[in-house]
């Protein structure tokens, strides 16, 4: 049976050779900084730039899990695309991409060996993507070597499911008993756990994340609370955001105050959830609230899948402004800081963090959140799950017509929740990090049985 084959999409041979030479010369690990999805392109910017500034030996590896230019342009926008060394170019379904990822890692490993690498190669995986989970797993299987997991310890919490129907005031959720939801969101809730299982150094954004990892049995010396790279990304984007053409592209957004809505999580791509949110938004627009719905690839696909494409026309007729995905990350930051953003209604983890850093009211369209600190500690966020159109409409109307401080009393406090200069701090940690020895027996080779 022939061996499966896969070719890397692109390799900067000179950058690869230079990084190997530096790691060998300095007798330091060669860090493989792994990009995967839109949040990675945004959040990892400051870390990549910091690693370059302190002259760490590293290779920037793009798996290709996201490849649409609208999703990946932050590499160029935030000033580090020139540092990209390897592109895997994986494509297809979740399982198909995972299979290709294994083959691509094998190809990269072969190139590192052919280039003469004598030091450990240590993956830096980020967040809760399938790439983060499986890159770390596959590297461990190949070498018996552990990874560094950035944004470790994210776990989803929320109120008991039965509590929502009796909730009169959305802010009362902070007084309810919250519990863990292990498989939410799908598949990210499991992916982030898998990424840490084969990690050696686990870098957690906030104290709650450290506590989650300790409860799961990870030893304290493996853990560091470092803040969130979202904080850096916002500050990196702010000077560029002033030049955003967003209001030239969409001049109506420069008038009034808008609820910005976006959805992409799989659990919100059901017919029931889509109808609840979109019909609820339509009713809100009839009430006179300005609503802009930013379409995502996931939303467009789900509307077609469930034969609900007509819902967009319905909500347009009721006054909801529907727009394609905004071209740049800096467009989002420009809008959030413009004075025209009333609040966010999103299922994005990154936007929950960015809204907290910027002091923008946030509502999360989920039954649980892997950023519970934004609701319970910073109090800059509230969960508003898509239970029904009436539920979404009633609570959006109520919370958006109240004084901001009643629903979001911690908007100013939240600005410091995720720290500052996080990428620089991580780069300084990596300068002195000693990678553990590979496991004994990990490189054992077995001869195939030859039929007699």
Please place each PLM-identified region on the residue numbering.
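Short internal beta-strands
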Residues: 57-65, 203, 290-297
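C-terminal amphipathic helix plus adjacent low-complexity
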Residues: 2-8, 13, 28, 401-452
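Catalytic binding pocket for nucleotide-activated donors in carbohydrate/polymer assembly enzymes
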Residues: 351, 357-404
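N-terminal subdomain of nucleotide-sugar transferases
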Residues: 2-63
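Donor-nucleotide binding loops and adjacent catalytic segments primarily
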Residues: 74, 242-340
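A nucleotide-sugar donor-handling region in carbohydrate enzymes
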Residues: 2-20, 63-69, 195-273
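A donor-sugar binding/catalytic signature common to diverse glycosyltransferases
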Residues: 125, 133, 149-150, 157-159, ...
């Amino acid at each position: 049976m022939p061996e499966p084959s896969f070719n890397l999409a692109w390799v900067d041979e000179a950058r690869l050779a230079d990084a190997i030479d530096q790691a060998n010369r300095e007798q330091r690990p060669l860090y493989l900084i792994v990009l995967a999805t839109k949040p990675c392109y945004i959040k990892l910017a400051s870390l990549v730039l910091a690693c370059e500034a302190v002259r760490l030996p590293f290779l920037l590896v793009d798996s290709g899990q996201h490849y649409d230019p609208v999703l990946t342009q932050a590499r160029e926008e935030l000033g580090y695309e020139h540092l990209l060394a390897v592109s895997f170019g994986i494509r297809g379904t979740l399982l198909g991409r995972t299979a290709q990822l294994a083959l691509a890692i094998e190809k990269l490993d072969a190139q590192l060996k052919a280039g003469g690498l004598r030091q450990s190669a240590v993956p830096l995986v980020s967040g809760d993507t399938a790439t983060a989970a499986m890159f770390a797993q596959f590297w461990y299987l190949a070498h018996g070597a552990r990874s560094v997991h950035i944004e470790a310890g994210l776990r989803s919490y929320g109120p008991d499911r039965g509590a929502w129907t009796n909730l009169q005031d959305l802010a009362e959720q902070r007084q309810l008993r919250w519990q863990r939801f292990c498989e939410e969101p799908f598949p990210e809730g499991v992916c982030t756990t898998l990424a840490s299982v084969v990690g050696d150094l686990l870098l957690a954004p906030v104290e709650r994340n450290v506590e989650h990892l300790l409860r799961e049995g990870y030893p304290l010396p493996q853990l560091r609370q470092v803040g969130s790279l979202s904080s850096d990304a916002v500050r990196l984007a702010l000077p560029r955001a002033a030049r955003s053409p967003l209001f030239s592209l969409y001049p109506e957004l420069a008038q009034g105050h808008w609820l910005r809505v976006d959805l992409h999580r799989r659990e919100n791509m059901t017919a029931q959830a889509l109808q609840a949110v979109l019909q609820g938004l339509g009713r809100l627009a009839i009430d006179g609230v300005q609503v802009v719905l930013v379409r995502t690839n996931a939303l467009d696909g789900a509307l077609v899948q469930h034969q609900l494409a007509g819902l967009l026309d319905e909500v347009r007729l009721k006054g909801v402004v529907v727009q394609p995905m905004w071209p740049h990350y800096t467009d989002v930051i420009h809008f959030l800081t413009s004075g025209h953003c009333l609040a966010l209604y999103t299922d994005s983890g990154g936007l929950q963090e960015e809204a907290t850093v910027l002091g923008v009211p946030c509502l999360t369209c989920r039954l649980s959140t892997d950023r519970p600190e934004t609701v319970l500690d910073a109090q800059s966020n509230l969960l508003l799950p898509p239970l029904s159109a009436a539920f979404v409409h009633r609570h959006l109307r109520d919370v958006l017509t109240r004084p901001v401080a009643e629903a979001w009393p911690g908007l100013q406090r939240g600005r410091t929740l995720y720290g500052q200069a996080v990428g620089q701090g991580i780069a300084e940690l990596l300068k002195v990090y000693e990678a553990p020895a590979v496991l004994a027996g990990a490189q054992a080779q077995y001869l195939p049985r030859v039929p007699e």
